[in-house]
Amino acid sequence: MNKYDLIERMNTRFAELEVTLHQLHQQLDDLPLIAARVFSLPEIEKGTEHQPIEQITVNITEGEHAKKLGLQHFQRLFLHHQGQHVSSKAALRLPGVLCFSVTDKELIECQDIIKKTNQLKAELEHIITVESGLPSEQRFEFVHTHLHGLITLNTYRTITPLINPSSVRFGWANKHIIKNVTREDILLQLEKSLNAGRAVPPFTREQWRELISLEINDVQRLPEKTRLKIKRPVKVQPIARVWYQEQQKQVQHPCPMPLIAFCQHQLGAELPKLGELTDYDVKHIKHKYKPDAKPLRLLVPRLHLYVELEP
């Protein structure tokens, strides 16, 4: 597919996403609200995106106002939806849950529109991250040339429906994204960045080429069978633990935006018990089990690329 067809399809899918999000807003707004609880987190200011987070103060909102905030959040996809002092590199987060009473017909209608919405989100992410063929540092320019001010992470995030949950409780998760990669994978990625011939701030084009060339040399010097890992820290994330009494099952969900709980009262479903998200303090985090990690040597800091050392 040529570039212009790709851009046209991206714009078309985004327009469809806006329509389905509006339809979802209308559908949910018409349903009887039985409970709503959302947790507002501090905004991340420009220039502070990469600072380690040690404390997060949580503000709770309940009832109709929580529902209003939650429904608005699903449609906050652009930079102009937030203050000028807020970082464009950090996605907005509003953990929580909105609980609605539904008939069988209403449940099917809502599930259909959520499924369609999530399919469009996944297709947009695939167009931008895979089909464009662009390395990550060039996607920003590609997206903002055609959808100016789009917050891609907010756009990609899927909407999570819950059917007759017994309880929804909240907490925090600290983790790393760890991925095994090959020497060839990394060289291909670096060469794609080099051949693109563009500058990536704060570097000039020449400085950027020099940096990438040095990284390529470092990787090429490794033996072919070297075990490589990308170990990228993920900032602390809100999560939800959902309990289903009948199935005796707990499901954990990432919770960057409100979950949508549908309660079928005519089938005897009760209002789920809702927990609270407490303030985060890194000093109070306790690990149930932390296995010994294999020793690693940092090779390419920009990519969080490590060489696994033999014990």
Swiss-Prot record:
Pfam families: Ter (PF05472). One of its GO terms (biological process) is DNA replication termination. Transmembrane segments: none annotated. The keyword DNA-binding applies. It is found in: Cytoplasm. GO terms for cellular component: cytoplasm. Keywords: Cytoplasm, DNA replication, DNA-binding. GO terms for molecular function: DNA binding. NCBIfam families: rep_term_tus (TIGR02648). Belongs to the Tus family. Trans-acting protein required for termination of DNA replication. Binds to DNA replication terminator sequences (terA to terF) to prevent the passage of replication forks. The termination efficiency will be affected by the affinity of this protein for the terminator sequence. This is DNA replication terminus site-binding protein. The gene is tus.
